[in-house]
Amino acid sequence: MSQGAKPGKGGMLPGRKVNAEIAKIRGIPEGQDSISPNGHPEIKNPADILDMIATVRNATGKPTGFKAVIGAYGWLETLFAEINHRGIESAPDFITIDSADGGTGAAPQPLMDSVGLPLRESLPLVVNMLEKHGLRDRIKIIASGKLIVPSKVAWALALGADFVVSARGHMFALGCIQAMQCNKDTCPTGITTHNERLQRGLNVADKAQRVANYNKYIHYGAGLIAHSCGVTSARELRREHVRIVQESGLSEPLDKIYENYK
């Protein structure tokens, strides 16, 4: 539905990265910018989202959901009410909530800087809305957006996420140096380029081990934080385990700042 770095806009793959293989797959001329629309023409309202989910689920037989960065949230109220009207089996299997401060290789600067809600607001908001509509057990919540260290992963789970995903963390594990050349096809580390000469700089065997080590550390670190909070796993973390420092310099637990959930 939308991405944190560019809510309200579709994707753009610069022409210099549209090689013969991509051109064939997408059905566009080689070397031409590939502009994706900012929405699906089949989806005009929240009810259409459920129709599309049913279509994809029936075609693939796999769990189906959607990803969105949250801004105005009235459409979610309508969506959840429609689910209860149709029946709980019509619900998406998951919703991925992307933070407004998420990253991308190409997006307009005003959208990256100023549009959408950060995860600290949108995640508890959506979790509470699911509780309100009795859908919390049916729909799983996936959190994304700069969740690259164990403390951030533990924080997201405490706020109500069922899962956490991270693109940025894995890019760092691969060796990303933030050269800011993703859109130019000149990534010096070989990660985001289609240039075969530059790609040779990415040693797959070496980077595979680094990525494995990164994931192992994330799991270990999140578990370590959970044990320090007195629970046996990170999935048992709740808002009461997290505190936020206020302007006064004193901290408040999240279950006081946000209405808690079961």
Question: PLM features: what roles do these ranges have?
Answer:
Residues 40-199:
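Glycine-rich phosphate/ribose-binding loops and adjacent secondary-structure elements
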Residues 1-31:
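Flexible glycine-/small-residue-enriched beta->alpha junction loops
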Residues 6-10, 105, 235:
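Short helix/loop capping segments that flank catalytic or ligand/cofactor-binding pockets
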